[in-house]
Amino acid sequence: MNKSTNIVWQKTSVKKADRQHLNNHKSAVLWFTGLSGSGKSTLSSALEKELFSLETHTYHLDGDNVRHGLNKNLGFSPEDREENIRRIGEVSKLMVDAGLITLTAFISPYQEDRDHVRATLAQDEFIEIYVKCSLDMCEARDPKGLYKKARLGEINNFTGIDAPYEEPLHPEIVIDTENQSIEESVQTIIHYLKDKQYI
């Protein structure tokens, strides 16, 4: 897929460490992964609001929103899902370089794709957050009506129904949204970020 030739990386005069120093916090990607309806978008949005109140520089990338623009030419085949996550990984890396804490809320069903994004970042810059919720509960919630459509055969390649979801092997954080409130979940992540001295 690498079609670019005759290009040279242009070094910048302002470094990532300079931006982190100015922002008074480390930059990182908080990578929320889980089934549709598990609570990724709700949790990541609530967390961003809390981080913002703590004067942290953040940006929130949501799966649906990104498919309205950057990834609007992609479908849901395994190949398109891989490219979707590759692009998000590259955008996230740019935002980390800009000194931001970037919150990404994507199903990102394949372990290999998540690992690829992790590999593009420094060791402590990728924080995988598994938003754990049973398929039964996600389907009962069904906030967008997608599970119903998938069961009726109106949507193909729907994760959890006729496409796989690979649970993270070693996530930094596991949030059980069946048993934890959004407020409790936000504080769990804030505690982690403070304990590891990101903020």
UniProtKB/Swiss-Prot annotation:
Gene that encodes it: cysC
Protein's job: Catalyzes the synthesis of activated sulfate.
Record-linked PANTHER family: BIFUNCTIONAL 3'-PHOSPHOADENOSINE 5'-PHOSPHOSULFATE SYNTHASE, PAPS SYNTHETASE, ISOFORM D
Organism: Oceanobacillus iheyensis (strain DSM 14371 / CIP 107618 / JCM 11309 / KCTC 3954 / HTE831)
Protein's name according to its UniProt entry: Adenylyl-sulfate kinase
Superkingdom of this protein's organism: Bacteria
Active site annotation, chain numbering: S108
Listed GO MF terms: adenylylsulfate kinase activity; ATP binding
Highest classification ranks of the organism: Bacteria, Bacillati, Bacillota, Bacilli, Bacillales
Claim: Transferase is one of the keywords in the record: yes
Catalysed reaction, written as an equation: adenosine 5'-phosphosulfate + ATP = 3'-phosphoadenylyl sulfate + ADP + H(+)
Xref: Pfam families: APS_kinase
Enzyme class: transferase
